[in-house]
């Protein structure tokens, strides 16, 4: 089991980064916020969880152990796999997620693409007593530049990858960039996620 990866960031894409450690490049899937805190050519450390399937081994990376624990906890809910767990962490930061679960805030949970009302209610029932809604002391992840391509295209592609309809993703990207045309990909993507969360 690979519990963490430390090394030079070789590549930053929309949904993953490649980090070289001891001569081996590890592809690590992560949320936009986590990827935004990385910088190509600089050293980084991510706490990781490895998901092993019959036909694949996938690494998921997190800025801290708290996020990793929530990722694992989410997957104990029936119908929630790694992809949906990551989408949840992309839309709701750890503090907001714990609060939503502890308070039974179904509306907040249904902002996540792929989670409907019944799924959100199931999450609350199964996880309410397992989370601590006390605010985290960990700092916010700093945002930085992402990969290639236009900022708009990257935002749309990332949102579609998280499960949002293409038209909705395009509208959110256009709205965010109209208000802040100089935004980096990571900043704009977080704004778009926030906007979509409010309109769901």
Curated annotation (Swiss-Prot):
It comes from the Bacteria. GO terms for molecular function: ATP binding; four-way junction DNA binding; four-way junction helicase activity. SUPFAM superfamilies: DNA helicase RuvA subunit, C-terminal domain (SSF46929), Nucleic acid-binding proteins (SSF50249), RuvA domain 2-like (SSF47781). Residues 147-200 are annotated as: Domain III. One of its GO terms (biological process) is DNA repair. Gene3D superfamilies: 5' to 3' exonuclease, C-terminal subdomain, DNA helicase RuvA subunit, C-terminal domain, Nucleic acid-binding proteins. Homotetramer. Forms an RuvA(8)-RuvB(12)-Holliday junction (HJ) complex. HJ DNA is sandwiched between 2 RuvA tetramers; dsDNA enters through RuvA and exits via RuvB. An RuvB hexamer assembles on each DNA strand where it exits the tetramer. Each RuvB hexamer is contacted by two RuvA subunits (via domain III) on 2 adjacent RuvB subunits; this complex drives branch migration. In the full resolvosome a probable DNA-RuvA(4)-RuvB(12)-RuvC(2) complex forms which resolves the HJ. Belongs to the RuvA family. NCBIfam families: ruvA. This is Holliday junction branch migration complex subunit RuvA. It comes from Rhodococcus jostii (strain RHA1).
